[in-house]
Amino acid sequence: MAAERTQNLQDTFLNHVRKSKTPLTIFLVNGVKLQGVVTWFDNFCVLLRRDGHSQLVYKHAISTIMPGHPVQLFDPTDEVASEKA
């Protein structure tokens, strides 16, 4: 039996928007608005790319992340199946 690795919601979200190249608006705690696509992230920072330029943003400075379009992280049919079991 293979061990199932669980990811936290933050990593799941960032990985999804990175892979799908979803455009984001990121608001920092000081009110600054950044826009771009996540190209890389780790436990401490996010690399945001826009118009050929990259910005390294520390996660502790991020207040809110808004994707440009709705993001579905989990399959709702899986939840229905697990509730019936």
UniProtKB/Swiss-Prot annotation:
PROSITE patterns: SM (PS52002). Keywords: RNA-binding, Stress response. GO terms for biological process: regulation of DNA-templated transcription; regulation of RNA stability; regulation of translation, ncRNA-mediated. GO terms for molecular function: RNA binding. RNA chaperone that binds small regulatory RNA (sRNAs) and mRNAs to facilitate mRNA translational regulation in response to envelope stress, environmental stress and changes in metabolite concentrations. Also binds with high specificity to tRNAs. Seems to be involved in the regulation of NifA. Homohexamer. Belongs to the Hfq family. This is RNA-binding protein Hfq. It comes from Azorhizobium caulinodans (strain ATCC 43989 / DSM 5975 / JCM 20966 / LMG 6465 / NBRC 14845 / NCIMB 13405 / ORS 571).
